[in-house]
Amino acid sequence: VAIPNIIGTTIRSFIFIAAALMGLGVIWLARAYLIGIIVIGIFSYWYFRDFPISKPDSQTFNSYKVYALPVAAASIFGVLKQYSDKIFIGIFWTEYQVGLYFGVQRIALFIGTMALAIEGMLLPAISNLHANKKENEIRTLVHDAERYVALICIPLVAMTIVWSSEIILVFLSKEFLPASNILKILALVALVRVLNRPWSVALRGSDRPDLTSILSILSSILSIILMLILVPKRIPQLGLENLFGLGGEGAAYAVLISEITVGLSLRILSYKYLEILPKSNFFVQMIVATMVGIFMWQVQETITVDRWFELFFMSGLGGLLFLSILLMLGSFTKKDFNFFWETLNPKSMKQYVGEELKRDR
């Protein structure tokens, strides 16, 4: 899954750069997306080159009816939720506010991309375990996925919150500094989404996409209702006056509240239908991250960071302090270290990619 997306995204990015440098206009930005999707489709098709194409039967259609239709319905609301924040800010505020929000949202989305990686790895594994009725293995897999993802994302989000202004100055510009609080909130949104994904995949991989789809639709509706309350100062058409008028911050809070609601609901549903309970590791990591964040906040008040390598160094120190405290508490073990070492080892990754490309069916 990753390789076609990497190739397609790389080609699309090169076209973006060429279009900007050569002044080709916005039409080439749209063409870049189209070309990228076509490239991804071609490479994805190549992966299925050894699979025969058979005539669909009633069993195939029934499986799509059970799984694909709920997911498709949820996807429609998901797209609406994805763009509703910018739409509401644009309607009730100005293009300037939309630009501030969109700019810092790009940074927060970098954290959220890990959710896609989790789904790509977990969904087939959980589906296979569910088919073989290995419920205990599913429980272990969900807990491990949440724990390992939290080990990476929690300190990353904590450092994003602490150094939000410096991140904006280094990667955007000082014009985006008014959106510092929005970046902090959206970083929390990304964290909640990533930590929710193992639980969502557990339900979908166990043949309950209907539950996650209904939850996605309800959360989209909740998010829109909250935006109507938090974003505008007033909606005279509806007779609503003296609203919160938080603008971009209100949109970010609306998304955060809806994602937290989704997270709580996913865990309740996972317990009810799969008998999977949350573990305490997550709460330990959150407490440690809060302590580290407070300490680094004091450091941030006393020093000036205005270069990218200084920013990476200070954030790295925060991450190292986070892991060190977990190590002292016994929440980070040699097994965890070996797991991350193998995951990040270029030699292991090269071997894995080579096996995928040269696999023998």
What are these regions (language model features)?
Residues 13, 17-21, 41-46, 87, ...:
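Membrane-embedded alpha-helical segments of multi-pass transporters/permeases
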Residues 100-217:
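Specific pore-lining/lateral-gate transmembrane helices of multi-pass inner-membrane transport
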